[in-house]
Design a protein with these regions (language model features):
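Bacterial Sec-dependent N-terminal signal peptides
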Residues: 1-23
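Extracytoplasmic
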Residues: 644-802
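An acidic-aromatic substrate-binding cleft motif
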Residues: 124-180, 186-206, 378-381
């Protein structure tokens, strides 16, 4: 056999494979074989979406037929092929055809929309003006195989605190209505389209009193059915009833199960009868009308007695109207705030009900399931926030929530058995686009991120997956060249906001009785640190402007559609520049209050710093105006972006006052070490991107790690060691550690906090839990600190010595 023969045969094989590839050329009719008569609405809706995507990308039309003959795409539903997994799909290229198989109609829909992704259509096509690029042809090689299935059964988002964004945008801009608080079917169809593109299936609708309730708005039920979305409700919205908005409209008397039982039951029964034939995730239990404790019952024991009766009565209604086997009805119980105390007091929640745990509203999961809770038939869920209204301070404006924190906490949640239900409080959707996609992608594919992981094993961070996810997001939206500049800027922006969110920069608080928290005042930062932070923001601000110029050139060359300028502004420029200007406004104001000089000048120029602060405020107004008016989208997002939600003091101009106390001084640090600078005999679990320096590490129970610092800088006979932790909550009861210096007797510290204590508020606002020890020190060249984790769940950020 000659080399010539081998090469000839190889080329023949390659040509054969190429000839059998699935290919669609621009303008070519795409024939799809589908038994639409047997399809559920969700799959039909996905086909309509694909049809529009094909027309947009290829300029081709799509034709549906009921035979596979001469079809280029063949749809099939086959539960057995996926071992009866829910919502699974397979894409396979064979003999010039593309086969899309689904284990059910949801799986088929996700498979259909996977083709849209392969065509280059972003899930944010509509919601971020991500206009797709046009192609001359699209192909998949012979043998292409893409099989996927969800890790979490119920995955979705919660629209919340919509008063200044989504609600006025919907009711006045996108879907104008004379009905106050209108969020109607046109808006919800767009939300559900996004959910399908992100492979989600669950929705908690907006529920503030300012918004007309979902089920009382004509057309909303029908559009949810069309998109195959499970409708649910938060911890204070049992039985598919938005209590905050609906009780005053259709309830009778007080919302008090103890003293008004029949009317409360009728309120729930009317709704269950109405929606019995629709996919609903029923939240069961009871709280107050809106995020308050239930009426009537005062003590924990009384609340337990009432809740026990509530659960029995609610399940009787579900058995009567939805399914006689009530265990087949999806149900959630959310032990939130005072209800968690009732649960811990011994409330018996039926075995088939999913327990939904919560974070502390700032991204730290409060409870991880015990072994007994993990074994429950109903499983465990999570209600997580990347946007929040409440104490100690709102963060509703900019989507600065740390992706690394979300990734770390949701990885821990999955690892500890929270795998049935994931819901994300997203505010108004915009501007939390990346966090939403990260959360839902994790819910979809956690099995591939952490294959084979069990709670008995230590969780090992998969930093490569997160880095790849971030890179893929930005390259998909803007291409590799722009993404190479954008990603580092966004990572630095997230890091700076992790240290202090833009909304926290005035040193004010929400819902506090003490009037001092309503007044803009100094942050406890030194002049050196303030100037360094201003420089960091100037650096990313300048880079963002430079990248904007690169985008304009790419559009001018035809490398990107012009509409991507709007997307660039929404996803990148506005969040970066608005955060930078918020810091400029408040930090230049702080320097001005203290009469500080511009670097290199010997004169008092506080007036010039006041001008910088004022200019930053004006800049935020201008930036927001551009966001709402757009470049090419004709004001599509008008009223979506409000730079001062709830009209809190932090959003005002900084009052021109004179400080009566000096600026804080930094300690004379002997050493300030990143957690990743430690020495350990056992493996270190680095959470890349997490913490003040993006190098936080998880320490497993009984693991000991060491730090070394130079003795030359030690001046006295004692040192203070400040251990700075990511302010997580215990996985069991406590978060303790021990520390020793130079082999001395270990001292013990605690990281956990109680409820909404003052220490928790401080930790939350600075995103660190700091524990200090002052210890005697001898003269030596090198000193060694040993830190040992006494409990599970500790994540170390920094160790500072002074």
């Amino acid at each position: 056999m000659t080399y010539k023969y081998i090469i000839t045969q190889s080329l023949a094989m390659l040509m054969s494979l190429a000839s059998n590839a699935f290919e669609v050329k621009s303008g070519q009719m795409v024939v799809v074989s589908a038994d639409t008569a047997r399809m559920e609405p969700v799959a039909k809706t996905a086909l309509k979406m694909l049809k529009g995507d094909i027309r947009k990308v290829l300029g081709s039309e799509m034709k549906l037929v009921n035979t596979s003959v001469n079809s280029s795409i063949i749809l099939q539903r086959d539960a057995a092929a996926f071992a009866y997994k829910k919502e699974a799909f397979l894409l396979k290229s064979a003999n010039g055809c593309l086969y899309i198989k689904g284990s059910d109609d949801h799986g088929l829909a996700y498979g259909i929309l996977e083709v849209s992704r392969l065509l280059g259509v972003s899930p944010w096509k509509w919601w971020a003006d991500a206009e797709p690029k046009q192609l001359k042809a699209f192909s998949l090689k012979e043998g292409y195989h893409n099989e996927q299935s969800p890790s979490v059964e119920y995955r979705g988002i919660f629209i919340n605190d919509e008063d200044w964004g989504l609600m006025p945008w919907s009711g006045k801009t996108y879907e104008p209505s004379d009905i106050p608080g209108h969020i109607g079917p046109k808006t919800n169809a767009r939300i559900f389209e996004l959910l399908l593109r992100l492979r989600a299936n669950t929705y908690w609708p907006a529920m503030h009193e300012c918004t007309r309730p979902f089920f009382l708005t004509e057309g909303n039920r029908e559009v949810a059915l069309q998109y195959g979305i499970y409708i649910g409700g938060s911890h204070c919205e049992p039985m598919a009833s938005s209590t905050a908005g609906e009780w005053k409209m259709r309830g009778v008397g007080e919302y008090d199960f103890l003293n008004n039982r029949e009317n409360v039951l009728q309120f729930w029964e009317d709704r269950v009868k109405e929606v019995a034939g629709q996919p609903i995730l029923y939240t069961i239990g009871m709280r107050g009308v809106h995020d308050g404790a239930m009426q009537g019952a005062k003590t924990t024991e009384e609340q337990k007695t009432v809740l026990d009766s509530v659960l029995k009565a609610q399940r009787e209604l579900l058995g009567k109207y939805v399914n006689k086997d009530v265990a087949q009805v999806p149900q959630l119980f959310v032990p939130y705030k005072e209800v968690l105390d009732v649960y811990h007091a011994g409330l018996q929640v039926p075995e088939d009900v999913c327990l939904v745990w919560c974070d502390d509203n700032y991204g730290m999961v409060r409870h991880f399931p015990t072994a007994e809770e993990r074994a429950r038939k109903g499983g465990n869920g999570i209600y997580y926030h990347v946007s929040y209204w409440g104490r100690p301070h709102d963060y509703l404006w900019l989507g600065t929530f740390s992706p690394a924190l979300l990734y770390q906490q949701m990885s821990e949640a999955w690892h500890k058995g929270i795998q049935k239900f994931w819901i994300l409080n997203v505010g108004d959707i915009k501007p939390a686009e990346y966090q939403i996609e990260l959360f839902l992608d994790m819910a979809w594919n956690m099995n591939r991120i952490y294959s084979g992981d069990t709670p008995e094993k230590e969780l090992q961070p998969n930093n490569e997956w997160l880095a790849e996810h971030e890179w893929n997001f930005w390259t998909r939206e803007f291409g590799r060249k722009l993404a190479a500049g954008m990603l580092p800027v966004m990572q630095e922006s997230y890091r700076l906001a992790y240290i202090r969110k833009p909304e926290f920069m005035a040193n004010t608080r929400c819902e506090e009785r003490n009037p001092k928290y309503k007044i803009i005042s100094d942050l406890p930062w030194s002049e050196v640190y303030i100037r360094a932070r201003l420089a960091d923001y100037k650096s990313i601000s300048d880079k963002a402007e430079k990248i904007g110029g690169m985008l304009d050139k790419a559009i001018a060359k035809g490398e990107l559609p012009k509409e991507r300028k709007d997307e660039f502004y929404q996803l990148f420029k506005y969040p970066v520049q608005a955060a930078a200007q918020m810091n400029n406004k408040l930090l230049y104001g702080q320097l001005a209050r203290h009469g500080k000089e511009i670097s290199g000048s010997s004169r008092d120029v506080s007036a010039e710093y006041w001008k910088k602060s004022e200019a930053a405020y004006d800049s935020i107004i201008s930036l927001t105006k551009v966001y709402n008016e757009g470049y090419y989208n004709q004001g599509k997002w008008n009223r979506m972006m409000d730079f001062q939600p709830r009209r809190l003091p932090v959003f005002n101009r900084v009052p021109h006052t004179v400080a009566t106390q000096p600026l804080a001084k930094d300690p004379e640090y002997i050493a300030c070490l990143s957690a990743n600078d430690c020495i350990s005999a056992s493996p270190l679990y680095l959470w890349k991107g997490l913490g003040y320096e993006c190098k936080a590490i998880g320490i497993v129970r009984n693991q000991e790690i060491g730090f070394v610092f130079d003795g030359k800088k030690v001046k006295g006979d004692s040192v203070t060691i400040e251990v700075r932790w990511v302010p997580t909550h215990p996985m069991d009861d406590k978060l303790r550690f021990s520390l020793s210096l130079d082999g001395g007797k270990p001292v013990e510290g605690e990281v956990q906090t109680r409820g909404r204590s003052e220490q928790w508020k401080v930790n939350t606002l600075q995103c660190q839990a700091r524990v200090s020890f002052t210890l005697p020190v001898a003269r030596m060249k090198k000193h060694r600190i040993l830190i040992k984790a006494l409990d599970e769940g500790l994540v170390l950020d920094q160790v500072c010595v002074y």
